[in-house]
Every structure is written in structure tokens, then in C-alpha cells.
Design a protein with these regions (language model features):
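N-terminal secretory signal peptides and thylakoid transit peptides that target proteins
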Residues: 2-19
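Sec/Tat signal peptide C-region and signal peptidase I cleavage site
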Residues: 26-30
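Bilobed "Venus flytrap"/periplasmic-binding protein-like clamshell domains
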Residues: 34-59, 63-66, 127-195, 302, ...
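Pocket-flanking alpha-helical
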Residues: 50-54, 66-111, 187-193, 207-216, ...
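A structural signal for short loop-to-beta-strand junctions that line the ligand-binding cleft
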Residues: 109-124, 255-265
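Ligand/cofactor pocket segment of small-molecule handling proteins
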Residues: 164-235
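C-terminal lobe and pocket-closing loops
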Residues: 224-287, 337-341
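Periplasmic-binding protein-like
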Residues: 293-310
Length: 343
């Protein structure tokens, strides 16, 4: 998606562009407007992709990325594949489901062809699944959520499906029978948990999450995990073994003194990424990739949740080829490019 006005990049690409540049006022050039879809506020994809947009908008004058933080990633990838949007969050798991026309893509006949139109700009750790409860709730394990109001993730999204499967794998609980899955978006769910209107709040995010850190300042919280005796079961291993997923650890002290966990919590870790359409301009993607990692390095210790967002992580768990512009940028940044990242 681009602005139909004359852009600096497009103008300079014309025969007369360079010669006429001095004769035109600066205001004659319009930025190229680009749409990027991500998850709601409080999620790590929102934080990372907001940072991406801010860095690009500040450092590359030819472009302006406008964020859309509504809807599910499963819808966003279809929009990008169809050329209706420019960038979105996706994941190795979503790519596998599209190829196999499975789960939320089961009724979308063109999904296997549409995934071929997507290209990876970069991957990054989404973080670990936080399953949060208040200390005052008395809940200390997943098998104690029966009858509770639970936010799994937005309906129809990958997070919702993952948590629904995890609760069944660990405790045998069925949504709608053993607990109530509250249907909310990310923003509304964070507010509902903060207001005490949810018993259990699930959010895949890098630790420490700003949203949960804010809650932990004035409230005792606990994070529920996968018990050791359940980790090696077939049902849990099917979750852990999905593309982009792994068993991961949420440290006991990640949220300070008000985190009640006395030991580290075993949960699910997940890799996600930013994808574009295969037809996105190569030089544009190259410039954006280089500018983003330069901006992340400049942020340093001021943004601790960005520490895991590195050039090396850009190809972690990758199962969708890199866009040629990203491939060029990451190669220049010294990243060892796996075969799966090459078209």
C-alpha cells in the first residue's frame, strides 16, 4: 500500500528526477505511506513493531509506517499476502498452518498459495507465555483454574488456540466446560486484568513486560507453568515441537519482589517475525532492516525488553525465505544465513 502522491524515491528514479530536484521545493515530495499490522498494546510484537515503525519514521525520510493494532495475526498475514497491507506480524507456526491449510486456515483454499507470496523481514523472540494470576486469588497451578474467568488471547488468534491446547494438555480442562474463556482483544484484556475482572491473564511477551511490570508494582502476582511431570507428555510435546515453539523459562525474579514464584517457571517460548509481500521494494527493505538494528543498538540498556532482538535472532526458527532486501542487510551485519531463509 503506497501513497499515490509523488514520492522522493519514485521521483529520483525517473529520467528527469535528479536534474529537476533543485528546482522543486521540499514540500513537493510526499512520504511513502506504509501500513503495518501488529497485536494490541502490552504484547511484545506491539512493542517491537512500534519501535520498528518509530525508528524508520525517524531515520528514513522517504517512508512513514502507520501502525494498525487491531485484529488477529492470522487475518493480517492474508492481507499482506494479497497486497492489501505492507507489513505484519507472523510466525513460523502460522506459515506451517497456511501451507497445510490447517486450524484457522482450514477453510481458506488459497492459503497454501498465499503463504508463497510472503517474505520474512526479520524474526524476533515474542518471549514466553505468561499465565498470570494475582497472589490474592489463591491459584498456584493450572489445575486450579476450574470455574475461573480466563483470557487466552483474542478469539481466532494463535495465542488463544495455543493456551486452549495447553490447559487441556496439562489439566484436561475444556474451554466453556471447565473455565470461561473471556472474549476480548489485547488492550481490553490487559485493562480487565488490571481492574480485577479476570482471574487468569495469558500473554506471550518478553520479560519483563511493561504492562505486567506496572501491575506488579502495587500487586503480588504469580505465574503458572507447566509441571515437570507434564512436560514430557505427548500432548505437551506436540505444543513444544511446533514450528517456532520451545520449552522456555520465566525467571523467578523477573518482576521483582511482588512476584511470588520461588523458582523459575517452565512455560512455552515462541518466535515471531515481521513479514512483507514478496513484491516489496528490495532497497526499501534493505534500508529499513539496517536502520532498525542500528536503532536497537543505539537504544542500549534503556529498553531491556529489546536485548533479545538481535540480527542473529532474525533467522531463528525461520521457515519462510527472507526478503532479498533483508537477506542483503543481514548478510552485511554478519548473520549466518540458513538454507531455510533463502528463496
Amino acid at each position: 500500500m503506497t501513497d499515490t502522491n509523488l514520492t522522493r524515491r519514485g521521483f529520483l528514479g525517473t529520467t528527469v528526477g535528479a536534474a529537476a530536484l533543485a528546482a522543486l521545493p521540499k514540500m513537493a515530495f510526499a512520504k511513502e505511506l506504509l501500513r503495518m499490522s501488529t497485536l494490541g498494546r502490552g504484547t511484545s510484537p506491539n512493542l517491537v513493531m512500534t519501535t520498528f515503525a518509530n525508528i524508520i519514521n525517524k531515520s528514513l525520510p522517504d517512508y512513514e509506517i502507520q501502525l494498525n493494532a487491531t485484529g488477529a495475526a492470522t487475518r493480517h498475514v492474508l492481507e499482506v499476502a494479497m497486497g492489501r497491507s505492507d507489513f505484519c506480524m507472523s510466525s513460523p507456526a502460522i506459515h506451517a498452518l497456511m501451507r497445510n491449510k490447517a486450524a484457522m486456515f482450514a477453510k481458506i483454499d488459497q492459503a497454501p498459495e498465499l503463504v508463497k507470496k510472503l517474505r520474512t523481514v526479520l524474526n524476533f523472540p515474542m518471549g514466553v507465555y505468561h499465565i498470570a494470576v494475582y497472589g490474592s486469588s489463591g491459584i498456584t497451578s493450572i489445575d486450579q483454574i476450574k470455574g475461573k474467568r480466563v483470557f487466552l488471547g483474542p478469539p481466532g488468534g494463535a495465542a488463544y488456540a495455543t493456551m486452549e491446547r495447553l490447559f487441556k494438555a496439562v489439566a484436561g480442562f475444556e474451554e466453556g466446560t471447565d473455565y470461561e474463556a473471556v472474549k476480548l482483544g489485547w488492550d481490553a484484556a490487559a485493562a480487565a486484568f488490571q481492574d480485577g475482572n479476570l482471574d487468569v491473564y495469558c500473554n506471550p511477551t518478553n520479560a519483563p513486560s511493561p504492562a505486567l511490570t506496572q501491575i506488579a508494582v502495587t500487586n503480588q502476582i504469580r505465574f503458572l507453568g507447566i509441571p515437570a511431570d507434564k512436560l514430557e507428555t505427548e500432548a505437551v510435546q506436540k505444543l513444544v515441537g511446533r514450528p517456532g515453539f520451545s520449552a522456555a523459562v520465566l525467571p523467578a525474579g523477573a518482576y521483582g519482589e511482588n512476584q511470588l514464584n520461588e523458582s523459575d517457571v517452565t512455560t512455552l517460548g515462541v518466535t515471531v517475525g515481521i513479514v512483507s509481500n514478496e513484491k516489496a521494494d528490495e532497497d526499501m527493505i534493505y534500508q529499513m532492516t539496517k536502520a532498525f538494528y542500528a536503532g536497537v543498538a543505539e537504544a542500549g540498556d534503556s529498553s531491556p525488553w529489546l536485548k533479545a532482538v538481535t540480527p542473529a535472532a532474525a533467522v531463528q526458527d525461520i521457515n519462510l525465505p527472507l526478503h532479498p532486501g533483508a537477506l542483503r542487510a543481514l548478510t552485511e551485519l554478519g548473520v549466518d544465513i540458513p538454507d531455510a531463509a533463502r528463496a
